[in-house]
Amino acid sequence: TKDKSFTCTECEESFSLKSRLIAHLLIHTGEKPFDSTKCGKGFRRNQYLKEHLSTHREDRPFVCTVCGKTYKYKHGLNTHLHSHKVNTYFPCSECRKIFSSKASLDIHLRHHTEKTFPCTECDKTFKQKKNLKRHQMIH
């Protein structure tokens, strides 16, 4: 394990790199120094901004040959193509929902099995404690 000698004074989370601590501190300050030039939305990390900018992509070059639906990304088309397979269904054993891919079912199953972290200020719940902490900063 790496030596985690950089500790946050707000929550005591430790990091092996000073740069990671500095990036982490933005969670506590609420600062979002990386802004989208398309819509103005702010992000704590440049990486998050880059991921967001892809949502503004206008061309949809990937076309389903079965129904004509278009996608910005090849993985979106590939996922969609599974919905055209006959008799390929993945039912949830906990409720009545049916999914066209095992990946979608697996994501859904987390709602039945994972521990949740409720916000004490509103009715939102989160699957990860870190997401609850981030959310609580808005209250």
Swiss-Prot record:
- Give one Pfam family: zf-C2H2
Q: Where in the cell is it found?
A: Nucleus
Listed SUPFAM superfamilies: beta-beta-alpha zinc fingers (SSF57667)
- Gene Ontology CC: one annotated term: nucleus
Residue ranges of the C2H2-type zinc fingers? 6-28, 34-56, 62-84, 90-112, 117-139
Alphabetically, the GO molecular function entries are:
DNA binding; zinc ion binding
| Record InterPro entries | C2H2-ZF_domain-containing, Znf_C2H2_sf, Znf_C2H2_type
Cystine crosslinks: none
Highest taxon listed in the record's lineage: Eukaryota
Q: Which UniProt keywords apply?
A: DNA-binding, Metal-binding, Nucleus, Repeat, Transcription, Transcription regulation, Zinc, Zinc-finger
User: What exactly does this protein do?
Assistant: May be involved in transcriptional regulation.
Family of this protein: Belongs to the krueppel C2H2-type zinc-finger protein family.
Q: What is this protein called?
A: Gastrula zinc finger protein XlCGF29.1
Q: Whose protein is this, by species?
A: Xenopus laevis (African clawed frog)
